[in-house]
């Protein structure tokens, strides 16, 4: 990817971000070469010319207007970071688009079987289509369609599969992929759904699908992700949560046979942001017509301040795999870590984009960049990145399949083109400062309300690695934290085989999955199914 000056920060965001969970497109070394940023900032003041100093305040003020963010509270360190960028290209930084252009779907003459509204979520409508079984994805009852937010022109696509076992009694799971900006249909066809897609673009039955003992909903959110579309834009997790609540309220109104069943929210990667926020939003609605029972987060990004400490240990031989970096590269990561953590702390304290955006840029460059230069898969430390689609060539088959006219017609899809990840959304969230915010606070809220929480992590993932996830769960300050800290780590077995390690106290569980990468159901399908089946049955101790 070539970097123009006018797309500098946008490219930083894209490079710093997402697949199914966090997306990282290109090596960070390219960014630093393009920017030639002095990340130490030690000699910044001496570099700035008098002429530049005169114009700098005006440029920063212009950016503040574009970002709709006041200048109050900027620390000297944060000012220095922005000044470093402005020094390199003072005449062109204001050309940046801090909000990506929305993706507008092509409205077609798709026919839907039902239209559902509810006074509790005004201005929302649910369209439902019975999906033909001869599409070959599964033989169970299945529905697809859209949640429409009429006045705001927002349209969220979903795909529902009934349980293969006992749909009248089995629980319901909502699955969310991350990114931010990646379609949950990736989870469907690549990880845990009823079928995968082969190179001939044909469905292949998955015996380890999570709908073995649960009905599963796959939701494309936020807007402009996957088959979802809008003329609007969204750039933060909290705003997305309100739309997800409206979707669930309407879905369970139309399908009251599922409303009284246990309901779980599961997801991975950036869903470490989504799920705590969405569950917290749901719990503020006592009038809801469904039964939120638990949440499951796999290889998530939830507490960046803790998790960013563990990129160097994971890359440098302390996570269970040999080091993939040279000693001097590991030293470089450690040297940049104190400033990284300081920037994240500023983001936690202020919540301002002025603090949170530089924290993302600096930390991703310093803590992920050296690993990315190796060409290794950020989602599986054991392998090299292959293919053009987020290190897994098979993902290209899914994109091709979901763009087949007959598939789009069968599902009622209303977009010109399906894309597994929308990197404009990724950039929007980054520029809103969402990446580095502390969503572990929402997890505390859930635990105090006695909602069961499972944090699971494949131990071969780099980008949201198990060391960081283990660390933030151990440091989480909630009423049961002392009990959780003292709880023993036990072996988790599937049959007679060791599948991982588990730590539990009351309704909070951390599970390390042996041999799993970022996408545990892809790498360990049988063990992942055992994990979810035991959890939804109420076995929180494993």
From Swiss-Prot:
It catalyses: Release of a C-terminal amino acid with broad specificity. Substrate binds at residues 464, 519. Keywords: Carboxypeptidase, Disulfide bond, Glycoprotein, Hydrolase, Protease, Signal, Vacuole, Zymogen. Residues 1-21 form the signal peptide. This is Carboxypeptidase Y. Pfam families: Carbpep_Y_N, Peptidase_S10. Residues 22-127 form a propeptide. Glycans are attached at residues 213, 291. Disulfide bonds join 182-421, 316-330, 340-363, 347-356, 385-391. Gene3D superfamilies: 1.10.287.410, alpha/beta hydrolase. The gene is CPY1. GO terms for biological process: cellular response to nitrogen starvation; macroautophagy; phytochelatin biosynthetic process; zymogen activation. Belongs to the peptidase S10 family. Its EC number is 3.4.16.5. GO terms for molecular function: serine-type carboxypeptidase activity. The active site is at 269, 461, 518. Induction: Transiently down-regulated during the early events of yeast to hyphae conversion. It is found in: Vacuole. Involved in degradation of small peptides. GO terms for cellular component: extracellular region; fungal-type vacuole lumen.
């Amino acid at each position: 990817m070539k970097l123009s000056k006018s797309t500098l920060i946008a490219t930083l965001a894209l490079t710093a971000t997402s697949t199914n969970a966090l997306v990282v497109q290109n090596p960070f070394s390219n960014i630093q070469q393009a920017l030639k940023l002095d990340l130490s900032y030690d000699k910044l003041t001496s570099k700035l010319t008098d002429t530049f100093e005169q114009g700098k305040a005006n440029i920063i003020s212009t950016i503040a207007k574009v970002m709709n963010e006041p200048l109050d509270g900027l620390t000297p360190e944060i000012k220095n970071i922005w000044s470093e960028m402005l020094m390199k290209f003072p005449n062109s930084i204001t050309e940046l688009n801090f909000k990506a252009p929305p993706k507008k779907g092509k409205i077609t003459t798709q026919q839907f079987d039902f239209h559902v509204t509810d006074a509790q979520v005004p201005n929302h409508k649910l369209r439902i289509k019975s999906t033909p079984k001869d599409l070959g994805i599964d033989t169970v009852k299945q529905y697809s369609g859209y949640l429409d937010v009429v006045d705001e022109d927002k349209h969220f696509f979903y795909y529902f599969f009934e349980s293969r076992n006992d749909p009248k009694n089995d629980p319901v799971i909502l699955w969310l992929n991350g990114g931010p900006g990646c379609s949950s249909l990736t989870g469907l066809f690549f990880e845990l759904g009823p079928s995968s897609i082969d190179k001939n673009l044909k469905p292949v039955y998955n015996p380890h699908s999570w709908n073995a003992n649960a009905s599963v909903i796959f939701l494309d959110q936020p807007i402009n992700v996957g088959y979802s579309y809008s003329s609007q834009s969204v750039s933060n997790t909290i705003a997305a949560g309100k739309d997800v609540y409206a979707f669930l309220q309407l879905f369970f109104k139309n399908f009251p046979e599922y409303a009284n069943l246990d309901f779980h929210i599961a997801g991975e990667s950036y869903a470490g942001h989504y799920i705590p926020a969405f569950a917290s939003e749901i719990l503020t609605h006592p009038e809801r017509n469904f039964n939120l029972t638990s949440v499951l987060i796999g290889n998530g990004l939830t507490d960046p301040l803790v998790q960013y400490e563990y990129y160097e240990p994971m890359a440098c031989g302390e996570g269970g795999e040999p080091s993939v970096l040279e000693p001097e590269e590991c030293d470089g990561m450690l040297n940049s870590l104190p400033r990284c953590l300081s920037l994240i702390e500023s983001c936690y304290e202020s919540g301002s984009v002025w603090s949170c955006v530089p924290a993302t840029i600096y930390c991703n460059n310093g803590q992920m960049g050296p690993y990315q230069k190796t060409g290794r898969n950020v989602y599986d430390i054991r392998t090299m990145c292959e293919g053009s689609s987020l290190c897994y060539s098979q993902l290209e088959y899914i994109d091709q399949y979901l763009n087949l006219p007959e598939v789009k017609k069968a599902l009622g899809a209303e977009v010109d083109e399906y894309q597994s990840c929308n990197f404009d959304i990724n950039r929007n969230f980054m520029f809103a400062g969402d990446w580095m915010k502390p969503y572990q606070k929402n997890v505390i809220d859930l635990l105090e309300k006695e909602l069961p929480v499972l944090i699971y992590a494949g131990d071969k993932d780099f980008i949201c690695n198990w060391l960081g996830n283990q660390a933030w769960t151990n440091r989480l300050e909630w009423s049961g934290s002392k009990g959780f800290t003292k709880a023993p780590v036990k072996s988790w077995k599937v049959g007679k085989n060791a599948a991982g390690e588990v730590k539990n106290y009351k309704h909070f569980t951390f599970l390390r999955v042996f041999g799993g990468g970022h996408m545990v159901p892809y790498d360990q399908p049988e063990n992942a199914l055992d994990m979810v089946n035991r959890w939804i049955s109420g076995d929180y101790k494993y």
